[in-house]
Amino acid sequence: MSDLTELTAEDKANVLVEALPWLQKWHGALVVLKYGGNAMVDEDLKRAFAEDVVFLRTAGLRPVVVHGGGPQISTMLDRLQIPSEFRGGLRVTTPEAMDVVRMVLTGQVGRELVGLLNAHGPLAVGLSGEDAGLLRATRRHAVVDGEPVDVGLVGDVVGVDPRAVVDLLAAGRIPVISTIAPEVDADGNPLHGQVLNVNADTAASAIAVALEAQKFVVMTDVAGLYRDWPNRDSLVREITAGDLAALLPSLESGMVPKMEACLRAVRGGVPRATVIDGRQAHSVLLEVFTTSGNGTMVVP
């Protein structure tokens, strides 16, 4: 039954009863959600995701949302007629493009999600990796044909100061974090106020580790991890960190950063990390509060 209105009163009660042990298990748990994929561009899925996050908070969990915004950045660059290209899987980010990245992530994607969440009450607060020194990053290069290639203002997260997020959680808020980060040198000192565009999957993983999250969830546009894509019978429901590390070299390129993020989270102390299908409405609730779960879970 796909529509809740089709359920009988007894069916609805059974749904709630099934959720009870999971409500008990996860009460008070800190959960980091990486928001992305089709759930960021489909209006119905946006609203469903916001409802899921508010449900988590109302049920006593402590959700933290981390987001990127690749499609929205590309759309704005095209609209402003700013050239954009990818090299070695990374967006070449010029200073002009970085202004757009900053504007779109913090001023558009983040604000929209905060608005959707706050439609249910004054709960969400938006911030970026720049705020209160939340993220620190160093510049990285792409690798093309085995050679390093300069891709401009693109970085890797090398440090997280979670205190601002902890304060927001203590105040009962839902932090919504956009993934840009101040550039630092090898000693961690800021470099001339420059900011870098960082991968949202890896940033979310680093934030989950720094917050000592009990759960890390990454939204994708597939049902989970497949051992032999596109063979849909090869969907993996659960995998250990060791087995995932061995499987990474054979994965489709689009899944690599997401599975690497899960691997880093689990190896960093997060008890479980899950990749879920963001194309399915309320996929977060299905993962957290049902016995069958959703997607692929990575465990130590």
Curated annotation (Swiss-Prot):
Task: Give binding positions for substrate.
Answer: 69-70, 91, 197
Per the record's keyword annotation, is Amino-acid biosynthesis included, yes or no?
yes
| Keyword list, A-Z | Amino-acid biosynthesis, Arginine biosynthesis, ATP-binding, Cytoplasm, Kinase, Nucleotide-binding, Transferase
Catalytic reaction list: N-acetyl-L-glutamate + ATP = N-acetyl-L-glutamyl 5-phosphate + ADP
Q: Name one GO molecular function term.
A: acetylglutamate kinase activity
Positions bearing the site annotation: Transition state stabilizer: 34, 258
Q: Which GO terms describe its cellular component?
A: cytoplasm
Gene3D superfamilies, sorted: Acetylglutamate kinase-like
EC supergroup of this enzyme: transferase
Q: Which Pfam families match?
A: AA_kinase
* InterPro entries the UniProt entry points to: AceGlu_kinase-like_sf, AcgluKinase_fam, ArgB, Asp/Glu/Uridylate_kinase, Glu/AcGlu_kinase, NAGK-C
Where does the record place it?
A: Cytoplasm
Q: Does the keyword Mitochondrion apply?
A: no
Its Enzyme Commission number(s) read: 2.7.2.8
GO-annotated biological processes: arginine biosynthetic process via ornithine; L-arginine biosynthetic process
| SUPFAM superfamilies cross-referenced by the UniProt entry | Carbamate kinase-like
* Role summary: Catalyzes the ATP-dependent phosphorylation of N-acetyl-L-glutamate.
Query: What protein family is recorded?
Result: Belongs to the acetylglutamate kinase family. ArgB subfamily.
What is the protein named?
Acetylglutamate kinase
Give the organism, scientific name: Kineococcus radiotolerans (strain ATCC BAA-149 / DSM 14245 / SRS30216)
